[in-house]
Amino acid sequence: MDPTLISLGALALAGAAATVSGCAEDLESDVGSQSNPNSQVQLGPQMGNIHRYFNKAISGEPVSYGLYVAVAGTIAWALINAGLNVVLAIIVGAGVAAIVHGAYSVSAFLGRTVGQSKKFGQPVYMDVLTSHIGPIVGHGFIAVFTMTLAAYLATTALGNPFPLPLVSLIFGITVGAIGSSTGDVHYGAEREYQKYPFGGGIPVANQGDIDIYAEYGVRNGLDSSYFCSRFGGPLTGLCFGLIIFLDGWRSILGNIIGGDLVTKTSIALLVGLLVVAVAAVINRKLEVYARNKYGPYRN
């Protein structure tokens, strides 16, 4: 079979895996309230809002997912070199990473909540711990498995020269950064502040004054994940999937058109710059259109 067709198929599969990974990563952080929105959850009890959110800011998402995917990639790499089937090796690696993820989540939830119990009256709800840890670990497993699969495809079919553990680390940091900057806005700026007018941002005076009641009953992290699965999660997946796909596509295009190594590299760089320029123009047009159509925010 033509090597170019194999590369295109591997790239399509890696892009699909990255899309699923980005979506699962964002929804996991919504269940556990990690990264940017967690500061608002942490401030909630200090503002008199006793809540039932799962509070687990282990670290920023880029750092934590860099760790999880690197653990999975390292274990998978060792097992593959030992002769184990590739899919089984990635599953085992993602399973170990899920256990690490769960251990950090439990310790972070208990530690951060207990730290606020005496002074601000925030209880440790054990049912919140038991009901949220499953979705956290489950979404995390899906994200890590698909991310490790994309990293494996990058190191084999797509010609990435670096070893699987290093590529896994880089991909984990990337997906965490995208989830933190893209999907978490839907949770932290919208879901946590639905009692305020839409579009007003989060003024300093409102920080920590989060919603503690849902459409029915008291709100928790599972409600947040359900809400964000309609927009924030898919948008994160689409963003990361496009990054993986377009980055691989420019390299493949350079290999097809170019002759020597310098020409291939130059074409790949030019195509990458063209993609960035087109994306910047589209973003600018969209922002101007939205501002002209809806106008400035008015309370």
UniProtKB/Swiss-Prot annotation:
Give an example GO biological process.
Answer: methylation
Give the GO molecular function terms: tetrahydromethanopterin S-methyltransferase activity
One GO CC annotation: vesicle membrane
Principal place of residence:
membrane
Topological relation to the membrane, as annotated: Multi-pass membrane protein
Does this UniProt record's set of keywords contain Translocase?
A: yes
Q: Name one Pfam family in it.
A: MtrE
Catalysis performed (reactions): 5-methyl-5,6,7,8-tetrahydromethanopterin + coenzyme M + 2 Na(+)(in) = 5,6,7,8-tetrahydromethanopterin + methyl-coenzyme M + 2 Na(+)(out)
Keywords of the record, alphabetical order, are: Cell membrane, Membrane, Methanogenesis, Methyltransferase, One-carbon metabolism, Transferase, Translocase, Transmembrane, Transmembrane helix
Per the record, the pathway is: One-carbon metabolism; methanogenesis from CO(2); methyl-coenzyme M from 5,10-methylene-5,6,7,8-tetrahydromethanopterin: step 2/2
Write down the superkingdom of origin. Archaea
Q: Where in the cell is it found?
A: Cell membrane
Question: Transmembrane segments in this chain: where?
Answer: 57-79, 89-111, 132-154, 164-183, 227-246, 261-283
* Coiled-coil residues: none
Q: Does the keyword Transcription regulation apply?
A: no
Give the record's subunit note.
The complex is composed of 8 subunits; MtrA, MtrB, MtrC, MtrD, MtrE, MtrF, MtrG and MtrH.
| Biological role stated in the UniProt entry | Part of a complex that catalyzes the formation of methyl-coenzyme M and tetrahydromethanopterin from coenzyme M and methyl-tetrahydromethanopterin. This is an energy-conserving, sodium-ion translocating step.
- Tell me the NCBIfam families matching this sequence: mtrE (TIGR01113)
Q: Which family does it belong to?
A: Belongs to the MtrE family.
Q: What is this protein called?
A: Tetrahydromethanopterin S-methyltransferase subunit E
Q: Which organism is it from?
A: Methanococcus maripaludis (strain DSM 14266 / JCM 13030 / NBRC 101832 / S2 / LL)
The gene that this protein is the product of is: mtrE
